[in-house]
């Protein structure tokens, strides 16, 4: 009968061990209280041998299942440590007089460790009552080690191997401590023994072995982010950091062997895939990208749903998603992480390292007034009002992911009562667009956020106008939140009910939106003042160029040409009167030295003969009844006697003039242009 009772207890413990739930572990660890023995020692040697053998079998089973989660890994470590203690302290019996105090301390630590387990309150109270009814003198250290270490006369605890698995490293100080004041020293002693044990941790090969070893000792501080490693061959998660439990609630090893994209929201999977496909060619071009270059984007990740207790049943929790900022880094798989019989050429087996950081709402209280130093975010939209770019900094302020806004009309996010203000704002945008790089700040206006509320924005507007077509290309708004929304959590689902607006107001709002889009599609005109300034500047440049061109002609070249015109003058010779048309030329207006050429022809009739001479050539013949002619060049004089007449005409230039000869100064090109 004794053997049957012990066998039934061990069977219940093994079933609880396979179930893995905290409730079964706790119930299995104290099942000895109802076995009929009340925790009293057994005097049969066969029972002792069976206990030792069963505990060793449990240790081997735990070593085989080392990848079952963080709690299982700690249990494996504790079992390995207890095995090492078994060989070291085989002959040392432990005192067993402080079991009640140790049980109370361990109960408190177990309540803290398993405070979030889904066990029912009645089961917990029943467990505590069973622990108080135990009259044992059993040692807590014997339960931690899980083996019998004394002879037949020594007290043995009732076999409960599950008590080893539920004790985390932080609770190790319960074993061997007689009062609560010595708890810290017991913890230090257990840590020291655990580290010195030969079966402390099995070496982990593959990605993330170092990070896996750091999270096993002591109390772990909650982290705000987690990292995971994904194989680019099939998209399977190879490793996750322990902080995934704090961030998303998943057990540490629950993601292993599953596709990462299964945990991404459906609407964000296309964005995730595009980031991967664009990042792979960049990562393959070695040397062109820095080693730590990352691409960041935002997605929604699924949170661990789990189950919650509701009376005697469980109720499924709704699936929820949380926004995260993902940083992607492509790495080549390490050589030692590959199997020995499978070698891959360099560059073909790549790993994707993802660092996920949760995005929190920027607001803490409803209708929060933010300071002037609050961060800004930019939203760019085209001339048709379609959003083309959103900063990732807008996620915490508006609740939208960038891919949620891109492709939508920005007019849908303005409050219907502020559309008239926005129409004036865009009129100013078109006027400022006449000057490149001009910006201005508009009046505050309300903007719709993800949870259905509105925030008050202050915006600095800039625009870009195509210099050739004079068309508006896009408008950029640098926004800053002036007043927060009524609901602080911007990531909550928007209410299904919509704001009721009259048909007249809806038609008016639609008309204003159409007017804004038409205004943005118009050609940006240049101001008249700018045109006048450009024409005046061009005239001045042309006149300056022509003056420079005329200055290149030297005054000496102009002197060789013809000068101003002088007045005609008369002069008288000794015996003849010559009528001469005189032309006087000069540059500076003063008479110069000239050379005159004259030709004279004379005809005389008389009874005598006459001879005319002059400078140059001239001949004259005369008979009494004949005629005489004479020609001459230059300044000539002629005399004749007889009854003949001789006349001479000539033209030439003289060195001086009696007429009024006036010099005309040169006229510049600018003056001539202005005179014309």
UniProtKB/Swiss-Prot annotation:
A GO CC term attached to the entry: nucleus
Biased composition (Low complexity): 1-34, 644-654
Short motif Nuclear localization signal, span: 53-66
Sequence repeat ranges, renumbered to this chain: 589-590, 592-593, 594-595, 596-597, 598-599, 600-601, 602-603, 604-605, 606-607, 608-609, 610-611, 612-613, 614-615, 616-617, 618-619, 620-621, 622-623, 624-625, 626-627, 628-629, 630-631, 632-633, 634-635, 636-637, 638-639, 640-641, 642-643, 644-645
A molecular-function term among this protein's GO annotations: transcription corepressor binding
Gene3D superfamilies in the cross-refs: PAS domain (3.30.450.20), Single helix bin (1.20.5.770)
Composition bias, Gly residues: 589-643
InterPro entries: PAS (IPR000014), PAS-like_dom_sf (IPR035965), PAS_fold (IPR013767), Period_circadian_regulator (IPR050760)
Bias (Basic and acidic residues) ranges: 108-120
A Pfam family matched in the record: PAS_11
Major site of localization recorded for this protein: nucleus
Bias (Basic residues): 53-66
Alphabetical list of PROSITE patterns matching this protein: PAS
SUPFAM superfamilies assigned: PYP-like sensor domain (PAS domain)
Domain PAS, chain residue ranges per copy: 224-359, 377-483
Region (28 X 2 AA approximate tandem repeats of G-T): 589-645
Region described as Disordered: 1-161, 583-676
Function: Essential for biological clock functions. Determines the period length of circadian and ultradian rhythms; an increase in PER dosage leads to shortened circadian rhythms and a decrease leads to lengthened circadian rhythms. Essential for the circadian rhythmicity of locomotor activity, eclosion behavior, and for the rhythmic component of the male courtship song that originates in the thoracic nervous system. The biological cycle depends on the rhythmic formation and nuclear localization of the TIM-PER complex. Light induces the degradation of TIM, which promotes elimination of PER.
Additional free-text comment from the UniProt record: The sequence shown here is that of clones MA-1, MA-2, MA-4 and MA-5.
PANTHER family in the record: PERIOD CIRCADIAN PROTEIN
Subunit details: Forms a heterodimer with timeless (TIM); the complex then translocates into the nucleus.
Record-given protein name: Period circadian protein
This protein's encoding gene: per
């Amino acid at each position: 009968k004794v053997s049957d009772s012990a066998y039934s207890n061990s069977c219940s413990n093994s079933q609880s061990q396979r179930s893995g739930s905290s409730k079964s572990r706790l119930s299995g660890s104290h099942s000895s209280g109802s076995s009929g023995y009340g925790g009293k020692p057994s005097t049969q040697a066969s029972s002792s041998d069976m206990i030792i053998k069963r505990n060793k079998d449990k240790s081997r089973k735990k070593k085989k299942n080392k990848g079952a989660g963080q709690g299982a890994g700690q249990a494996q470590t504790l079992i390995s440590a207890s095995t090492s203690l078994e060989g070291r302290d085989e002959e040392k019996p432990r005192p067993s007089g402080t079991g009640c105090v140790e049980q109370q301390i361990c109960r408190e630590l177990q309540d803290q460790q398993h405070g979030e387990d889904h066990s029912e309150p009645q089961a917990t109270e029943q467990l505590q009552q069973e622990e108080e009814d135990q009259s044992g003198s059993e040692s807590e250290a014997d339960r931690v080690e899980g083996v019998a270490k004394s002879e037949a006369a020594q007290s043995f605890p009732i076999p409960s191997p599950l008590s080893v698995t539920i004790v985390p490293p932080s609770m190790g100080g319960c074993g061997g401590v007689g009062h609560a004041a010595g708890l810290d020293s017991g913890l230090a002693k257990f840590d020291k023994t655990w580290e010195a044990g030969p079966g402390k941790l099995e070496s982990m090969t593959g990605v993330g072995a170092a990070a896996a070893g750091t999270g096993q000792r002591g109390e772990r501080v909650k982290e705000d982010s987690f990292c995971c490693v994904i194989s680019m061959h099939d998209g399977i998660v190879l490793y996750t950091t322990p902080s995934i439990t704090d961030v998303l609630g998943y057990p540490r090893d629950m993601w292993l062997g599953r596709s990462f994209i299964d945990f991404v929201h459906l609407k964000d999977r296309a964005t995730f895939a595009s980031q991967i496909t664009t990042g792979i060619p960049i990562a393959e071009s070695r040397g062109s990208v820095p080693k730590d270059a990352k691409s960041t984007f935002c997605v929604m990740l699924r949170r661990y749903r789990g189950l919650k207790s509701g009376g005697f049943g469980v109720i499924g929790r709704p699936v929820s998603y949380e926004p995260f900022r993902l940083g992607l880094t492509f790495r080549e798989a390490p050589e030692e992480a590959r199997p020995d019989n499978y070698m891959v050429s360099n560059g073909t087996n790549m790993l994707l390292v993802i660092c996920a950081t949760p995005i929190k709402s920027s607001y803490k209280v409803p209708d929060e007034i933010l300071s002037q130093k609050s961060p800004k975010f930019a939203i760019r939209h085209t001339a048709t009002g379609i959003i083309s770019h959103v900063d990732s900094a807008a996620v915490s302020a508006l609740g939208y992911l960038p891919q949620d806004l891109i492709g939508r009309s920005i007019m849908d996010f303005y409050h219907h009562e502020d559309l008239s203000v926005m129409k004036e704002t865009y009129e100013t945008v078109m006027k400022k667009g006449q000057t490149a790089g001009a910006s201005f700040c508009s009046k505050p206006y309300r903007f719709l956020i993800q949870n259905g509320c509105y925030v008050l924005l202050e915006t600095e507007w800039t625009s870009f106008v195509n210099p050739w077509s004079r068309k508006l290309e896009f408008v950029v708004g640098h926004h800053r939140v002036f007043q927060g929304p009524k609901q602080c959590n911007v990531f909550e689902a928007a209410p299904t009910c919509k704001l009721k607006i009259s048909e007249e107001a809806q038609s008016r709002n639609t008309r204003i939106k159409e007017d804004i889009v038409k205004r943005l599609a118009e050609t940006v005109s240049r101001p008249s003042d700018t045109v006048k300034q450009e024409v005046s500047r061009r005239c001045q440049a042309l006149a300056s160029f022509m003056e420079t061109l005329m200055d290149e002609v030297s005054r000496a070249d102009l002197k060789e040409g013809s000068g101003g015109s002088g007045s005609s003058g008369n002069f008288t010779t000794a015996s003849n009167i010559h009528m001469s048309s005189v032309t006087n030329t000069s540059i500076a207006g003063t008479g110069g030295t000239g050379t005159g050429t004259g030709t004279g022809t004379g005809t005389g009739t008389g009874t005598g003969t006459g001879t005319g001479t002059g400078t140059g050539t001239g001949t004259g013949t005369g008979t009494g009844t004949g005629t005489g002619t004479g020609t001459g060049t230059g300044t000539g004089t002629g005399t004749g006697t007889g009854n003949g007449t001789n006349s001479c005409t000539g033209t030439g230039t003289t060195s001086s003039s009696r007429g009024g000869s006036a010099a005309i100064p040169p006229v510049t090109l600018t003056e001539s242009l202005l005179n014309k």
